[in-house]
Amino acid sequence: MKQPSRSSPPPRIRAKQRRRAAGAPQPAPRTAVFLDRDGTIGEEMGYLNHLRRFHLYPFAARAIRRLNRRGIPVIVVTNQSGVARGFFPEALVRRVHRLLQKRLRAAGARLAGIYYCPHQKSDHCACRKPKTGMLRQAAREHALRLAGSWIVSDRYSDLRMAPRVRARSILVKTGYGRGDYQWHRKTWPRQPDRVVEDLAAAVNVILRSRR
């Protein structure tokens, strides 16, 4: 079964193995915030087939920085089926993610990891959202607790992951979100936990929930 790809630095697996071997106590798993990429952090461009087409929303870095300051891991999980469809090479996905990390770092923000699925639906992989493969891989590699974590996206289909791992969901009205909410919400079998204007508003909800 095909597995998700990652664009973040390799996890410190050896150090973790040494701690386990030494019998050292393991840190309690933390909850995290999982963000979609296109339409949530950056502008929705359809199939993003060139580096110059990537544009970070002006509020995104500050929103992520606020989560960083509270010690909340922030992880991107994104479907990039354009790779499987032959619209662009997988190397471009990694270049976009390096640029994303660079721009966030310049604004004092950081991501704990970026995971992407390069497959299309017909590949029957384990990682394409709304399947939970990317979430579960991130949880293993970063010692996270999915139950109680947050999933934020402009696509309702992504938020279908949330009940499968007992996470909470926020639909943002950037990207496809506004139209998805206006025209399709009555057909949704389960409503998102919250619906807000953008990522900045989503972070307000998340931080208030932790008081």
Summary of predicted features, one role per range:
Residues 51-55, 88-95, 129-130:
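Alpha-helix N-cap and loop-to-helix initiation/capping positions
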Residues 150-194:
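Acidic, Mg2+-coordinating phosphoryl-transfer loop and its flanking beta/alpha structural elements
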